[in-house]
Amino acid sequence: KDPGWDSPWGRGRPGWHLECSVMSEKYLGKIFDIHGGGLDLIFPHHENEIAQSCSNNSTESFANYWIHNGFVTFNKEKMSKSLGNIITISDAVKQYSGQVVRLALLSAHYSQPLDWNDELLLNSKNTIDKWYKLYEETKDTNILDISETLLDDLNTPGFIAKIHELYNAAYNGDNESKSLFNNACKLIGLFNVSKQEWENLKKSNIKVSEEYILKKIAERTKAKKERNFTLADQIRKDLLGQGIVIED
């Protein structure tokens, strides 16, 4: 029998909207800063939370900021237990380093959908591998020139684009950009191990799916047919970097 209680309106129990309002007030107070949740909870769940909390507490607001995240898919399919394709953070870091997982997650704005797949993770790994070429210890923490991007609703893709720009400038000899580049990477949790430790991590066995390998081979075959040998060679090098050898 479902749990319930008698009331002037009949037997029943608090709904899930009320549960969240009660927990929020107990642990955070009548008005607090940030409330998060998926885009699918904006209505009716969050709207009902606001209505009942404000009515009960005689306040004009409930949470000062609402953060609604987009959905994560796996190879363009919805992640769900029924499909058996749930990937947890602990699962991901067993296959890739924490830095790679972090950069992959930050590559999309929190409010936008993100497709989790081998290509995303390998691109993130290759990016960090490239960035480590300009890694340096620095005591300077100046990033004011580019941090405004993050202040724009946590625009992480825009911030990462700025890091790419700084890398290019630093690679061409701009020392000021090199310092900013390193500080920006550290701000989002990258460069949390030394260059040597990163090299050791690269040697660990990173597995890629058969589906990904076949896809890249097909792309290379197509590139060769179109006489795009530059692309074909790049795909071959990328696969070689992942421990996959192609022999023509």
Residue ranges and their predicted role:
Residues 1-139:
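Alpha-helical recognition segments enriched in aromatics with Gly/Pro capping
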Residues 78-248:
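Structural preference for alpha-helix termini/caps and helix-kink/transition segments
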